[in-house]
Amino acid sequence: MKIGLFFGSFNPIHVGHLIIGNTMAETTDLDEVWYVVSPQNPFKKNQSLLHEFDRFDMVTAAIANNPKFRASDIEFSLPKPSYTVDTLTYISDKYPQHSFVLIIGEDNLDQFTNWKNHEQILHHYSLYVYPRPDSSNSFLREHKNVRLVAAPLLEISATYIRNLVKQEKSIRYLVSKEVEELILSRKYYSNY
């Protein structure tokens, strides 16, 4: 199978993440999209994160009804911070029967040369890139392993959602009903 790996903090997972995943699953040659919950992004060292298992629970709840989606906690057992190249190597060794593609936003493509061993990633893996606001035209757009995928341009921010929760305002329609129920019942982000 050809699997798209969609890495993220998912703090929380929101409808923007789901729309991007669905677009990738339905409009490209991917068989599945795996939402890889990252315990710690090396570029966001000081970010206040909900515990990784709580974020994994939200991802699992959000994608439960889509057979083309899968939640992955594979980075939980790897050294932190999580570097994409290390996870890709590990996951490719663990699942040699699959081929993997990296799903990233255009804003990440702009910063891709700052990633650990980015040349190795580009040499061995394809990047499926979705549009993001305020992205520049990275020279990597022309790379043979970079595929630009037409997807809705969404400006939904997890920070915005967390702030709404803290202010006791509705997050309806920004997250799935299942995620909203988890956030409210477990009081996630109330003291953010």
Curated annotation (Swiss-Prot):
Gene3D superfamilies with a match to the protein in the record: HUPs (3.40.50.620)
Keyword annotations of the record: ATP-binding, NAD, Nucleotide-binding, Nucleotidyltransferase, Pyridine nucleotide biosynthesis, Transferase
GO biological process, one term: NAD biosynthetic process
Pathway recorded for this protein: Cofactor biosynthesis; NAD(+) biosynthesis; deamido-NAD(+) from nicotinate D-ribonucleotide: step 1/1
Catalytic activity: nicotinate beta-D-ribonucleotide + ATP + H(+) = deamido-NAD(+) + diphosphate
Similarity field: Belongs to the NadD family.
Function: Catalyzes the reversible adenylation of nicotinate mononucleotide (NaMN) to nicotinic acid adenine dinucleotide (NaAD).
Protein name per its UniProtKB record: Probable nicotinate-nucleotide adenylyltransferase
Organism annotation: Cytophaga hutchinsonii (strain ATCC 33406 / DSM 1761 / CIP 103989 / NBRC 15051 / NCIMB 9469 / D465)
